[in-house]
């Protein structure tokens, strides 16, 4: 959500920022609605003052005038509410303003590689895809999932199910014991107000799994990411500055329709309607966002370092960032079967964008009430990490070596073989 006062005070800066996002917004309409809204408020305040003055008078002849003023106040209030609603609807559909140091570009082709780490495996055989490996092991069953549930689902079985669970536990243990995050086991259902707070609504309504519940008039959704529920923990709060930074982590199933992904990654586990993800969320003082983003990204890459998986870090350009982000680092892991890097984590600073929607604040050194900064990042996507292990640790006979870091979570087995 955007600060209308800031827009009003520097219209050209706002327009330039939107241009960097490559979106078209009628800023003049926003300013016109804002002016009308303020005019109605001023008219109402003048009428309320006049009514108050009349109430102090003992002149009974003014009684009828007071009644007319009450009607006028009601009419103006309705007009003002309509204008305010239209203004907020437009503002809530506009993405966050990019941080000045984010590279300008229209799409992923303008993203900038920051670094690479790890050694890309040099196989003496043609590497198989994760879904070929999993099906040959009899541990990934996409056909059965299609039969029971539909496309973009999978049954993960036996040792691969164990590996998936091991990954989640390993990631949580690392983030809690080494990186200083507090583990949370949150609800998996969010209200529309909660989804609005982090920016999923109203913009991405069509990509959410909505629940139809007879016992409530509120709309409710399966969470697309734990970011939604964790970030909203501070909704409508004034937080004690001493509690900042707040760092939280959760491992949850996530649910997405993938509405804009028709025809993409139709095979395998890369893009599914249901998947597990370990999510990190930080709530910080507003001027600490970018240092916290660097820290969070390092926490995510540490997992890949421990698993000895090759990856690269990129900074997203203005046109490729998510709706709520002011700056984003993506971490991409190497997939041998595709001969390229694929996203496994996205870490974003949202500045005060989500906080303004949630009314999440704290008292600064001057005792002023100001908006917090919010950040979120995958640490990591569990299914995609499973994919990366299958492909990078595969052997010529189709077996999969277990990474050293995961052996304590896997009863110290060395290798996953066909059942």
From Swiss-Prot:
Residues annotated to bind L-serine: 225-227, 279, 378
Reaction equations catalysed: tRNA(Ser) + L-serine + ATP = L-seryl-tRNA(Ser) + AMP + diphosphate + H(+); tRNA(Sec) + L-serine + ATP = L-seryl-tRNA(Sec) + AMP + diphosphate + H(+)
GO molecular function: ATP binding; serine-tRNA ligase activity
EC class name: ligase
Example GO BP: seryl-tRNA aminoacylation
Pfam families documented for this protein: Seryl_tRNA_N (PF02403), tRNA-synt_2b (PF00587)
Gene Ontology cellular component terms for the protein in this record: cytoplasm
ATP-binding among keywords: yes
Compartments in which it is found: Cytoplasm
E.C. code: 6.1.1.11
Record-stated family: Belongs to the class-II aminoacyl-tRNA synthetase family. Type-1 seryl-tRNA synthetase subfamily.
Entry domain remark: Consists of two distinct domains, a catalytic core and a N-terminal extension that is involved in tRNA binding.
Oligomeric form and interacting partners: Homodimer. The tRNA molecule binds across the dimer.
Name this polypeptide is given: Serine--tRNA ligase
Organism per entry: Pelagibacter ubique (strain HTCC1062)
Lineage, top ranks: Bacteria, Pseudomonadati, Pseudomonadota, Alphaproteobacteria, Candidatus Pelagibacterales
Gene this chain is encoded by: serS
């Amino acid at each position: 959500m955007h600060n209308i006062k800031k827009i009003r005070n520097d219209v050209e800066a706002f327009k330039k920022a939107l241009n960097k996002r490559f979106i078209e917004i009628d800023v003049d309409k926003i300013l016109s609605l804002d002016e009308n809204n303020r005019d109605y408020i001023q008219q109402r305040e003048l009428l309320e003052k006049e009514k108050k003055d009349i109430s102090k008078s003992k002149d009974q002849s003014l009684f009828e005038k007071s009644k007319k003023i009450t009607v006028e106040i009601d009419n103006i209030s309705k007009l003002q509410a309509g204008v305010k609603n239209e203004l907020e609807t437009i503002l809530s559909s506009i993405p966050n303003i990019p941080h000045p140091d984010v590279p300008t570009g229209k799409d992923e082709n303008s993203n900038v590689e920051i670094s690479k780490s790890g050694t890309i495996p040099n196989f003496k055989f043609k590497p198989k895809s994760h879904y070929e490996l999993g099906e040959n092991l009899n541990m990934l069953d996409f056909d059965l999932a299609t039969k029971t549930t539909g496309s973009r689902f999978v049954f993960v079985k036996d040792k691969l199910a164990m590996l998936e669970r091991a990954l989640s536990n390993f990631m949580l243990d690392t983030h809690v014991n080494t990186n200083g995050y507090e583990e949370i086991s949150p609800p998996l259902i969010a209200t529309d107000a909660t989804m609005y707070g982090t920016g999923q609504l109203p913009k991405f309504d069509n990509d959410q799994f909505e629940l139809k519940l007879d016992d409530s008039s509120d709309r409710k959704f399966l969470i697309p990411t734990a970011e939604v529920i964790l970030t909203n923990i501070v909704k409508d709060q004034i937080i004690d500055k001493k509690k900042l930074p707040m760092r939280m982590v959760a491992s949850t199933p996530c649910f997405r329709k993938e509405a804009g992904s028709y025809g993409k990654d139709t095979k395998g586990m890369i893009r599914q309607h249901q998947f597990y993800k370990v999510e990190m969320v930080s709530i910080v003082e507003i001027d600490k966002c970018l240092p916290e983003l660097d820290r969070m990204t390092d926490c995510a890459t540490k997992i890949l370092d421990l698993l000895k998986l090759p990856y690269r870090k990129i900074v997203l350009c203005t046109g490729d960032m998510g709706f709520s982000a002011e700056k984003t680092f993506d971490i991409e892991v190497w997939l041998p079967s595709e001969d390229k890097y694929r996203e496994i984590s996205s870490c974003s600073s949202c500045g005060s964008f989500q906080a303004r929607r949630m009314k999440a604040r704290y008292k600064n050194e001057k005792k002023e009430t100001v908006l917090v900064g919010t950040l979120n990042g995958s640490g990591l996507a569990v299914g995609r990490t499973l994919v990366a292990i299958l492909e990078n640790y595969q052997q010529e006979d189709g077996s999969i070596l277990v990474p050293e870091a995961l052996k304590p979570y896997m009863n110290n087995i060395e290798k996953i073989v066909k059942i």
